[in-house]
Each structure stands twice: as C-alpha cells, then as structure tokens.
C-alpha cells in the first residue's frame, strides 16, 4: 500500500464527508487507506465516520478526549502504508499537496516532509503572530530549520512513525522527535492554507503557552531524560562544592583572626555562613533528586494507554 492518511479529529462532523471526497479526488494515482481517529467527539462525528467507512476507510474512537498526540499515536500504530501522511480534519489542509510531498520522500530521500503555511488564513494578532514567535523559538531550540513546525500536514516514511513515541502534547514537535531518533533528513514544502469552513478553531492562548513549556520539556528530556542523574547529580555536586568552599573560607578566616589576636564575628553572625549552608543543602537535595529520577526512569510504565471504544 502506498499511503496511510491519518486524520485526528474532535467535533468535525460537518467537514468529514467533504474531506473524504477531496482526498479521493486528489489521490487517484495511489493506493491508500484513510484512518479517522475520533478524539472523543460529542457532535456526531463518529456517526459520520461510520457512514463513510469502507474497505479503505477506517475509524478509531476514543472513549473520551485525550488530545491530538494520543490520536496521532493510535493512528500511527494502525497505519500500514509505506508513507504515512497526517492532516487536520477542518478542511484547512489541502490533500492536493500530498502527491508532491510523497515525491519528495521517494525521489529526494527525505525521511519527513512538513508543510509550511506561508499565507495563513487566520487572525493575524491572535494566531499568526504567536505562531511566528513560537516557530522562531522552536528553530533556535531544536536546530531544525522549519518555518511551520506545528503544521498538521506532514508526510513520513513509515519507519519514522513506527520509531517515535508521541505523547502528552508532543505532536507539535514530531520533527524534533524524528531527528532525535536518527531521522534527520527533514524537508519542507509551502502549502496552501484554506479558511475554516465549518466549526471553530480549537486554538487558544493556553495552547500557545503550553507549546513553549512543552518545547522546554522536550529539550530537557532529549538530553537528560534517559539519565536524570547526569543533570541533577552534576548540578548537586557543583552546588555542594560551592557551599563547601565558602565554609572552608569562613573557617580559615576565623582561624587566621584567632591566631593573630584579631576580632572576628561569630560564624553564625555572618550572612556568608547561611549562603554556604543553603548551597550545601541544595546540593544534597539535587543529588537525591537525581537518584529519584533514575528510579522513576527505570520503572516508568507505558505512557500511551488510551481507552478505545470502537474500531471500524
């Protein structure tokens, strides 16, 4: 099979029949399967999926809303195509872009091709500006030169999606996850962005803020997640040494003054003593945090455990 088209969705009942027809018209030269992942919709989206289901159209229905990362995780697990394509269900992504993205993977050797919405059909202040700021930061932190890291329209070699774990809100950073897994040939294609035809956008400032927090978390985990002691232990030792050096200096100064008959304030009357004590205590706490992190890391249970109500 050439392609698996994975479409995560939440309350997009009105757009689904038109989206399927658009995909069918755009991919006549390919063999493909269409996988709708209903993330706990309450507007009858599942009924629509059942109505359009067929030999090449499948559906996965969650018992409740878990988020886009969960939907992509289950969609990736179910995908059988040589190339896996993700797109949103709101008709703002154009399936007509998919053949060129597939060509880039097949002929130019890319592991992943991400869409770039150069001319967004969104509110400039509430969505476009935050998106530009977010993507600029993501480029600086990840080192991946993509203009639109969070674009829903992406194409992957199958081995990419089978070797990454998408959890929490990490769907925004799949290119970074892929890069860390060794799939570092990442391309970009400008794509047309359509105005939303049905429903309302799920984007809000809370998602914008969470995106930055997730980026920092991913950066940290990619470097120290497997060995938390490397970070906490090193920080703890450095902090302990700072406190130890300050303590030695205080004691040496006291002994010097006593040996020369000079007055010297009591150790506990000196602010430096309390700074030294604080540094030593923090150092010990950070070191212990490293041990706890190692224990949690070695005994962590599977993160992606979602309750699926139905499959078709």
Each predicted region: which residue ranges?
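Cell-envelope/extracellular polymer assembly enzymes that use nucleotide-activated donors
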Residues: 2-4, 33
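Donor nucleotide-sugar binding loop of glycosyltransferases
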Residues: 12-15, 41, 68, 94
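Short, well-formed alpha-helical segments that are part of the catalytic scaffolds
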Residues: 12-26
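Short beta-strand/loop segment that forms part of the nucleotide-sugar
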Residues: 20, 31-41, 60-61
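A conserved acidic beta->alpha catalytic loop
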Residues: 38-47, 91-92
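Hydrophobic helical membrane-anchoring modules
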Residues: 176-312
